[in-house]
Amino acid sequence: MSNEEVDDLQLRVAKAIPSDVGHGRARVPFDNDLNLKPGDIVEITGEQKTAAIVWRCRPEDANLGIIRVDGIIRKNAGVSLGDKVSIRKVETQPCQKLILSPVMAKQQKVRFGPGIEGFARRGLNKRPVVSGDRIFIPGMTLFAEALLFGKVKPLQKESSLE
């Protein structure tokens, strides 16, 4: 085995733990050459690229070579259960402004009340967002269904979240 540093890791996609759904988490084994620790951000590459927050895998998953992610992350990466993805640790920049667009039928309309910016900000705090991703803000629902946002566009230069 060489002393070269490994840049990425190949893992097979598995279903997320129910409590992780919608939180942008990826459960990965820590006994790997990427030196990952909880809270790190990884880029997940399948057909497309997305990002997730690293969480410790379950003990029974430690030697299986899998990454547990939810359906939103799988869709953003363009992969299905059982597909192989490549992950690598990345450094992120905080975004100052994030443009969100609710995913809904053309005839549906939604109006958000005052305070929605703070609610969204708290729900997305420290979550990695890649331009074009679909995301779910925990606790934000419409008619008891999760409200999905698409065409996400993070901006670095602006000073407020709208």
Residue ranges of predicted features:
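AAA+ P-loop ATPase mechanoenzymes
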Residues: I17-E162
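Intrinsic disorder/low-complexity signal
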Residues: M1-R12
